[in-house]
Amino acid sequence: MKRMRLKAVLFDMDGTLLDTAPDFIAITQAMRAAHGLPPVDEQRVRDVVSGGARAMVAAAFGLSLDSPEVEPLRQEFLDRYQEHCAVLSRPYDGIPELLAAIEKAGLIWGVVTNKPVRFAEPIMQRLGYAERSRVLVCPDHVTRSKPDPEPLLLACSQLGIDPSRVLFIGDDLRDIESGRDAGTKTAAVRYGYIHPEDNPAHWGADVIVDHPRELIDVLDRALCDC
């Protein structure tokens, strides 16, 4: 990545900044137990996390997305998640070091997510990131979510930083499309919730990494004449 006088780094939340899948998996397992069913293979749920609650309950219960049984299960999932959205979620290995490096470099950071604010805020607070993050943009704050550029443009506006001075990091094509259309630099991460049929190499990101610590090197290169 060429030098870009970076001023801010924005993260997608699920599958990029945080591994929130353990809470999703625990809830779907509890739901199956409540419905008299045995545990499901965790990977079935993890593979479709990026598809949201509907995709996760469909996978957990072996249903098609258009099954009439999915909607009541989705609502049950969301009700349970409201009470247990910040129990097992953790930052990915290497994220604490990355955030420390961002702050040490004098940059600011924030989160742009498609997760509703009623879930996103408690998670950020519980993990101690609410005070450190300078912006949190959720679907509640915009008329169009990612892949539309509106959430990224709102975050940049709230920070008072031109999008060209921002790096947006995500684990889904919609993240890269949103960042690119907003005018930010983009980084795709392979460690997140990527569907087995997806290939980040085809997304058009400025850089692709396999581990959060690699992003420290990306920032170093972006901030120097190397």
UniProtKB/Swiss-Prot annotation:
SUPFAM superfamilies: HAD-like. InterPro entries: HAD-like_hydrolase_sf (IPR050155), HAD-like_sf (IPR036412), HAD-SF_hydro_IA (IPR006439), HAD_2 (IPR041492), HAD_sf (IPR023214), PGP-like_dom2 (IPR023198). GO terms for cellular component: cytosol. One of its GO terms (biological process) is peptidoglycan turnover. The active site is at residues 12, 14. Its cofactor is Mg(2+). Keywords: Antibiotic resistance, Carbohydrate metabolism, Cell shape, Cell wall biogenesis/degradation, Hydrolase, Magnesium, Metal-binding, Peptidoglycan synthesis. Pathway: Cell wall biogenesis; peptidoglycan recycling. It catalyses: N-acetyl-D-muramate 6-phosphate + H2O = N-acetyl-D-muramate + phosphate. Disulfide bonds: none annotated. Disruption phenotype: Deletion of this gene increases ampC expression and promotes beta-lactam resistance similar to other peptidoglycan recycling mutants. This mutant strain is hypersensitive to the antibiotic fosfomycin which targets MurA activity and thus blocks the conversion of UDP-GlcNAc into UDP-MurNAc as part of the de novo peptidoglycan precursor synthesis pathway. GO terms for molecular function: metal ion binding; phosphoglycolate phosphatase activity. It comes from the Bacteria. It holds the Pfam family HAD_2. Mg(2+) binds at residues 12, 14, 171. Its EC number is 3.1.3.105. Coiled coil: none annotated. The keyword Metal-binding applies. Specifically catalyzes the dephosphorylation of N-acetylmuramate 6-phosphate (MurNAc-6P) to MurNac. Is involved in peptidoglycan recycling as part of a cell wall recycling pathway that bypasses de novo biosynthesis of the peptidoglycan precursor UDP-MurNAc. Plays a role in intrinsic resistance to fosfomycin, which targets the de novo synthesis of UDP-MurNAc. NCBIfam families: HAD-SF-IA-v1, HAD-SF-IA-v3, PRK13222.1-3. Belongs to the HAD-like hydrolase superfamily. CbbY/CbbZ/Gph/YieH family. Phosphatase MupP subfamily. This is N-acetylmuramic acid 6-phosphate phosphatase. It comes from Pseudomonas aeruginosa (strain ATCC 15692 / DSM 22644 / CIP 104116 / JCM 14847 / LMG 12228 / 1C / PRS 101 / PAO1). The gene is mupP.
